[in-house]
């Protein structure tokens, strides 16, 4: 394991140990980070632009309150389906090291979007592929390909309701009913269908958790709040520049990836053109036959034209046969560098970025914690973050008195901000902060 990866895991453990992140619910999502440089790296799918692009992925795990505490930085050759089990395993290991009980570890609830919809992934999380059949986690996910059957359900079946209490937006009441569906390559799966809004839009939710383990109301609450993670990623993107990388270093790949043989693609295109020509000629024969029956064309002329067309079809069929033989001789996949005149794909070294992202996520979490303290003295919830920024970015004087370092903020004209700033300083002073150098001088904050 590289140093950056180890640092990320150790910080994740400390988030759990110090109560900054809460164990129990883990939302997992990925963010595509595009790369516009000159190096040849693998491509991924840009969800916003809907095109393949060179880039990498940041996979983030957050708790029920959307506190980011575990994340991975990976090349775009690794997707969310592969990373969900890895993040779960890392999270459980760090949970054990942080002192979480084994019962709580095994009852971890994992929530992800439709991108994680996969029978193979569901079976892996259920433990179907493990020798000991041990479940990895309780998963909750939106179902795919359910648009048709959910709208065929009778309105009367939606006889239960749950109120979703969001962090900022107004609460919403949803109707739902519980059933069971058969999923290809997985089998029977617990399903909850919800109906929302005036338009009565319907969506299906899949989970492997039993009724005893997790109630339907909680399942609906958890997955409907999943947008909180999307908002978190946007905040990390725009306020903390999570897409930034402090330089790019590359590493050679152990093996060049195998790609579809372009010669086969070229031959298949050529074969398709020939088959289209054959079909057009067959249509021409049918048209001639109709024209002859209607008396528009003599039988002799039709037969002469038909003989000529059939000869052309025979030639084209022979060409198609030769192309098929050529395709069979060629390998289906070839190495990337063999196709691109020796140019090789490389992978980016993410060590600097991992270290920097650890700092950024730590700063984000500390800002959230300070907002919690500030909210005791500043009651405008929607303005709490701007108020905090006004305080922490305020000009200050530093004064050393004896062995105490005083940080003195200039007072604020706004009385509400001034009041909140003074009490925030008191909260910080109660934590007994000190300088991180060898002197360990006590720090005292005040507003004057």
What is each model feature region?
Residues 223-259, 313, 317-323, 327:
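C-terminal, active-site-flanking charged/polar segments
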């Amino acid at each position: 394991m590289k140093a950056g990866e180890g640092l990320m895991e150790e910080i994740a453990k400390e988030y759990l140990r110090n109560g900054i992140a809460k164990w129990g619910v883990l939302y997992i999502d990925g963010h595509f980070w595009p790369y516009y440089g000159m190096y040849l790296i693998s491509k991924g799918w840009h969800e916003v632009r809907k095109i393949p692009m060179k880039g990498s992925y940041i996979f983030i795990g957050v708790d029920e309150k959307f506190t980011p505490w575990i994340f991975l930085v990976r090349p775009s050759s690794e997707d969310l389906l592969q990373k969900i089990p890895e993040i779960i395993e890392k999270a459980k290991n760090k949970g054990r090291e942080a002192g979480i009980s084994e019962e709580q570890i095994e009852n971890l609830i994992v929530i992800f979007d439709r991108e994680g919809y996969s029978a193979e992934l569901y079976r892996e999380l259920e433990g179907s592929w493990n020798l000991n059949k041990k479940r990895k986690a309780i998963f909750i996910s939106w179902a795919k390909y359910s648009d048709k059957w959910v709208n065929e359900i009778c309105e009367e079946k939606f006889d239960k309701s749950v109120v979703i209490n969001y962090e900022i937006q107004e609460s919403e009441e949803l109707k739902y009913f519980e059933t069971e569906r058969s999923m290809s390559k997985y089998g029977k799966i617990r399903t909850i269908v919800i109906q929302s809004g005036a338009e009565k839009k319907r969506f299906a939710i899949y989970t492997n958790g039993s009724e005893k383990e997790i109630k339907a109301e909680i399942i609906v609450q958890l997955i409907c709040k999943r947008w909180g993670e999307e908002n978190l990623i946007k905040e990390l993107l725009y306020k903390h520049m999570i897409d930034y990388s402090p330089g790019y270093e590359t590493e050679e790949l152990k093996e060049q990836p195998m790609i579809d043989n372009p010669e086969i693609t070229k031959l298949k295109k050529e074969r398709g053109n020939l088959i289209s020509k054959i079909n057009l000629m067959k249509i021409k024969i049918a048209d001639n036959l109709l024209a002859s029956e209607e008396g528009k064309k003599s039988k002799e002329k039709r037969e002469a034209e038909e003989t000529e067309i059939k000869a052309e079809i025979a030639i084209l069929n022979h060409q198609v046969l030769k192309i098929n033989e050529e395709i069979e001789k060629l390998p289906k996949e070839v190495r990337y560098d063999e196709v691109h005149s020796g140019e090789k794909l490389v992978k980016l070294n993410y060590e600097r970025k991992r270290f920097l992202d650890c700092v950024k996520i730590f700063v984000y979490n500390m800002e959230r914690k300070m907002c919690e303290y500030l909210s005791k003295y500043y009651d405008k919830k929607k303005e709490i973050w701007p108020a905090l920024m006004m305080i922490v970015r305020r000009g200050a004087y530093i004064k050393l008195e004896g062995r105490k370092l005083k940080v003195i903020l200039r007072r604020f004209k706004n009385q509400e901000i001034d009041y909140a700033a003074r009490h925030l300083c008191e909260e910080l002073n109660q934590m007994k902060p000190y300088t991180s150098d060898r002197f360990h001088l006590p720090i005292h904050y005040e507003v004057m």
